[in-house]
């Protein structure tokens, strides 16, 4: 993950942070998931490798406050200059109060999903990575089914 992430950042360094923020702001969100997160924001966390400067608007929109673990970047003159912290999901896991539920779709989510009491592979946007399929206790492909299941767990 680290190498591919740094390569992606290197490509996006040429684009102003404000433009990336605008793209992120226009991503269609799963409304039922947004409502779930807002309802349970004190019990929900976002753990992502994405850069803080790219997702700050999204985090604010969700009202997540400090319940976010993400990578951090140095910005100068409106452009990413350097990444000074890449989130390590396994380190985040060790900070979680047990038991916890984890939802993810990518290879970099597998350790977190495996460590969770309930690990959910969610294929709502793209196929669930094989590494997640191997360790998930559940796999869901529809937003309404995911939200229904999460509501049963809280």
Residues covered by each model-derived region:
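A metal-dependent, Asp-based hydrolase signature
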Residues: 1-39
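C-terminal cap/substrate-recognition subdomain and adjoining C-terminal extension
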Residues: 25-154
């Amino acid at each position: 993950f680290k190498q591919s992430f740094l390569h992606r950042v290197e490509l996006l360094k040429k684009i102003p942070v404000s433009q990336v923020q605008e793209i992120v702001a226009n991503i269609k969100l799963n409304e039922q998931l947004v409502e779930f997160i807002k309802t349970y924001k004190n019990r929900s966390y976002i753990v992502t490798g994405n850069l803080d400067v790219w997702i700050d608007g999204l985090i604010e929109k969700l009202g997540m406050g400090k319940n976010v673990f993400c990578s951090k970047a140095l910005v100068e003159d409106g452009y990413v200059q350097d990444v000074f912290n890449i989130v390590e999901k396994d380190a985040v896991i060790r900070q979680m109060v047990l038991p916890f539920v984890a939802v993810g779709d990518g290879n970099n989510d597998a350790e977190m999903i495996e460590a969770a009491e309930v690990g959910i592979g969610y294929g709502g946007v793209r196929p669930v990575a094989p590494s997640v399929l191997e360790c998930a206790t559940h796999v869901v492909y529809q937003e309404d089914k995911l939200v229904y299941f999460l509501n049963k767990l809280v």
